[in-house]
Amino acid sequence: MGFSDKQQKILQILVKEKEGITIEQFSKILEISRSAIHQHMTVLERDGYVRKSASMQTGGRPGTTFVLTEKGIHIFPKHYSLFSEILINLIRQKLGSKGLIEYLQELGVSLSETKKQALKDKPLNEKIEMAVAIMQELGYEAQIAKQNHTIDAYNCVFHDLAFKNEEVCELDLSLLSSLLDSKIKHVCCMAKGDKCCRFKVLPDDKAKTDH
């Protein structure tokens, strides 16, 4: 994602001005023409970083304000991984590694609760297809593997965290186990050097996970 200097300044202004800014206001702040601002806003709106909001009066003339979209907000640095690592370490210190695993398993089950009802009473193959779609919604590059009843994920949404704390994988296993009401075998793991994370669904033994 490449932004010009002016586009970066526009985004930086909008992250501070939650109620939005008009083209007229941008023109005054950045000291460039309204037509130049309009061109930048057209590009940013087209690419999904800003959107038009309410109209407001600016210097006697009505103007449409622009605000950041969720996509626009997410370009700014966040420190979720640092926060998550501190949280994981604190839980391990208080509960031990076993307690951390149990906590992550509970988290996986909780994550599945809003989605699980849609999979109820479906054939296993259909459940697996739906579970893959749910994983994709959560940010995984997941697909059904060639092997029967197997899911491959080619990225890890907890990448750095999982590489430093292998217990984090329990969340994935618990999520899939709860969604599919089946035992899940963690066949391959990127945190251990494999090319993907591979999850084998074992339909005969319910609601357990297995490395």
Predicted regions, residues:
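Conserved segment of winged-helix/HTH DNA-binding domains
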Residues: 63-97
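Residue-level marker of regulatory loop/turn positions in helix-turn-helix DNA-binding domains and
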Residues: 3, 76, 80, 168
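Short, charged/polar, Gly/Pro-enriched secondary-structure boundary elements
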Residues: 71-76, 158-161, 205-211
